[in-house]
Amino acid sequence: MSNQLPIHDDLIVYMMQFLDDCSKRKFISTCRFLLELQSRIYYDDEVYVYNEVQHLSYSEFFKRLYYYAGIISSNINFIPQNIEYLQIYRDVSIEDLFEKNAEKLGSIKYLDIDEIDTGKINKLKNNPNSIKTLFVSNEQNILNLLIPSINKLYIHYHSNLDLNLSFSKLTRITFHIGFNKSTDFMFPESLEYLDLGDKFNTPLTPNSLPKNLKHLYLGYKYNYPIENCLPYGLKHLIFGHLFTQKIKNAIPETVTHLCMGGRFYRKVKGYLPKNLIHLEFGWGFNKPLLGEIPNVEYLKTGSSFEYPICDDSNPSKITHLIVGSKINKSDYVLPRNLKTLILDLDYDDPTILFKIPNSVTNLVIVNSTSIDLGSFDLNCYDHVTHLTLNTFVKGSLKYFHNVDTLILDQYFSTSLHNFLPNNLKHLYIENEIYKKQKQFIETNVIIHTFKSSWFSETEDKFLSKFWYGESKYDFIDKIIEYHKKYDNNKFIQKPLVESIIPIKQNSNHDCGLYCPFSKDY
């Protein structure tokens, strides 16, 4: 059937790359001509279970598949031609799989092997050298898995690490669960990214980390001294929740991004690298910072922090600031160049809200009680275009004329009747709240709904270890990630997590905010 549309086939295929998988199917099902384009349309939003798609006429066009011997025969004889992500679980014979599908393996980039007998993968005749990223689980000997093309290695559970990795060309290693061994074995000199996992709590030793390391993540439990252990040249450094050691003469001057854990409470005066541009502290930190962070652009402090961060003698370059309740003082000075301000407050009448700099366009208010908008000087908010609220609000936002994007947390309890800004364009709202109050929303407002959990059950299994504390603080961290994405700010993120971002709206508005697994893994 010829193309009856006033648009070239190639352009149609190109535009469909920006649709989610469900929308792709709906779109090409509208006419016979579009169905004929199926051979050029691929589905890669998520990892699909093989037995759930094998019966489909377009099963050849899935790029991410999950094979599980418990639900299909271990004698697999089908792999899609252009598959990029292959996940294999339990009694599937990977040797047979590769031998029978040798001509289809050239496109595989990500291989995930879980609880199977791997054999000598690197000795296979039809070993797919296109593989760049490898995931392994259980007590597997990684020597049998490493092949020359692999540069990223993700290790789950208790994989066998009693080996020398120095021969490989790995640039990234991530341990997820269970790793707590000495780092006496040799990491490859090519390694740039290392995540030691949340259970790692074994002392680092001098020269145990490769000299070319740029990104280091020490997990939840790590709490040993680090002096003389970190290589010069390190750029990004993240400590876990339990870390409380001294950092004097321990952090290289090359570090530009530093995140401290929730229990870190020690003084940092004179100990922070002068090149820092991104700095985060947890809830336990409450030590002076004035004059210590001249180049920091992104600063997050915890609920205990109450010291000034700038004054006339110590100007600040901070453009993104997250602060807690203790800074609610009449004489507290906020940086003049702020663009994003996230406030975690515990007062009905927060003084700090009357001192918002004119430079702020992105404002997040997290409050455990309520806020009375009637007491606000609206002239202070003419510059705000993005506003986020998570609490009960008295009054109306109608006179916040420049707010075009509004995010309401799942615990937001105010009626939307005569509440929303007059010029609102985008509204992010929990799905059930939307159903109850949609009659109060103008038809020209683009709705983005999300489920009350913000994340799916599968995602929460991976994400739960990154957020601690009460739901209020969960919300703060999640919304921070969204606004980092909005501001296009360069920031540290955990390897399996992307920012919360708005996704495409579908016909029933049930699309929302989500936290997808990165396709880069």
From Swiss-Prot:
One Pfam family named in its UniProt record: FNIP
Protein name: Putative FNIP repeat-containing protein L162
Keyword Repeat in record: yes
Keywords for this protein: Repeat
Keyword Ribonucleoprotein among UniProt keywords: no
FNIP repeats: 179-221, 222-263
Species whose genome carries this gene: Acanthamoeba polyphaga mimivirus (APMV)
